[in-house]
């Protein structure tokens, strides 16, 4: 197995849905199914924060979501937890700057997909040199979902990464909605990652479909 090609990775990032049980006000499996029907291209399991599942409940829930993703041939990525990703044979893992370092993650994960959150050019270059397949750049807009976020960068921060010669696939993160998706893509992102724009939408299907349309229109 070889590492994922850049073109394929770029396409997978178009509509990147991130979710845990505590991000939904209704059945998370129903939300994910609607989102998959609507056109989610990659999914990240992020079970963190107040009211999140732990232990066996967390593992069982992850497996249920993974099974659903597999039915749609949509990659299932685990946030932070490399051991869980290995246990589940997930398609990949996403790590932040405060999580396990990219070098040891790449050693453990082999050729699986690895995404890294990057806030500076230095972080981005280090991640790429040590095996990141894509970067999560942000927060682009203010967000209420993640409490521990860095300073908001705006689309200028994203454009700056491209201006500095960062060519790997990038997904925009933080406060992204249907209304501001076009600006994120036009600034240089290959796709948008969202939590509440889908998880709290009246119709996860409609919200995902509109996000997908905006991305494709703006690329």
Curated annotation (Swiss-Prot):
4-amino-2-methyl-5-(diphosphooxymethyl)pyrimidine binds at residues 44-48, 79, 117, 146. Mg(2+) binds at residues 80, 99. It holds the Pfam family TMP-TENI. Gene3D superfamilies: Aldolase class I (3.20.20.70). Disulfide bonds: none annotated. NCBIfam families: thiE. HAMAP family: TMP_synthase. This is Thiamine-phosphate synthase. The lineage of its organism: Bacteria, Bacillati, Bacillota, Bacilli, Bacillales.
